[in-house]
Amino acid sequence: MFEKPLGMRDTFPQIFEKVEAVRQTGRDFLTKRGYEFIKTPAVEYFDTVGKASAIADTHLFKLVDSQGNTLVLRPDMTTPIARVATSKLLKEMIPQRLAYFASVFRAQEAEGGRPAEFDQMGIELIGDQSVFADAEVIVTAMELLKHLKLEAFKVTIGHAGILNCILQDYTESIEQQTTLRTLLVHRNYVGFEEAVDSFNLPKAKADALLQFIEEAMDVKDIRDIEKYVRKNDALVYMQQLAQLLEMADLAAYVTFDFTLSSHMSYYTGMLFEVFALGSGFPLGNGGRYDGLLEVFGSKAGATGFSIRVDRLLETLHGQSEMQQEATVVLFDEEQFEAALIKVNTLRAAGKLATLQLRSSLVDEEAFLAHFTEVVVVGQEEIGSE
């Protein structure tokens, strides 16, 4: 009777405070870098945002309004922001630097064990097609994580266009390309090899695909994969991106993996994922999604990233934390006025202070354990830790 809907979670006070700390720190950091925060509705039209989103239809929360329109709870923030930018903001200024901290919703299967609602923090840089915009997004993501006191992380960068080109050149059907791309999304390299064998491709093509997968997962020099790719500007673009990240003194955090593929199908160019010690899943991801804005009638370039706040907190968990100083003022009924004066004095001094009637406590010892200082009105301070 008292169960929550599948995939929904309660946020208890201690976690809530940590989430708010991340929100405030992130907002201050991103605002100082020229990003303006935006909020979009939790509910959007299925025919626009729902269909444009890269989230599978089976993972959308759908509902119907009183006029019979099919709606969805927003499954991501990039698509709603693309809607807002193309309909209004890009008419005011180009490029747009937008930021957000919001919940997104994705329906889960019973055995999935994953949250159906979670917070994301991220940015979208809309209206700039240059490699410098992609570099800015990656650098901002890394510097944000460092600002949040996360040092042990890696950023893996790939390119959707280069991977698509290779799959097109070395397979013989769209179905084969889709199969291999799906296996790469799930990092199922054994399955990839088995699929290539099952396609009965010409030996030269099959060997090239398997050799590419082996070499492309940890590329030291982007020129090493030139032999697999038809001449195109994407390789030059990625070489420029690598140089810009070196100039930002962040190359030590970066690896290039040209097998990287995402379930977010709107990525058209550079894409990346952030991995950190302490989390079994990517902490965040981002990339260039120029094609998404065309759905809303604009040809402006766009790039961005998002961080999963719950996974960030899991990663930060265990790092040294100082307990926040908190005082409780205990009083008996006849001491209320004196207790009120005392607690207001503490609060005016900037302290976190709670006022508590002593007779209402069921387990005084357990209650007081949550405070670093205890003041009993009418007595001297009786405890501090």
From Swiss-Prot:
GO MF annotation, one: transferase activity
Keywords: Amino-acid biosynthesis, Cytoplasm, Histidine biosynthesis
Signal peptide: none
Pathway connected to this protein: Amino-acid biosynthesis; L-histidine biosynthesis; L-histidine from 5-phospho-alpha-D-ribose 1-diphosphate: step 1/9
Subunit structure: Heteromultimer composed of HisG and HisZ subunits.
Record-stated family: Belongs to the class-II aminoacyl-tRNA synthetase family. HisZ subfamily.
Function comment: Required for the first step of histidine biosynthesis. May allow the feedback regulation of ATP phosphoribosyltransferase activity by histidine.
Protein name: ATP phosphoribosyltransferase regulatory subunit
This protein's encoding gene: hisZ
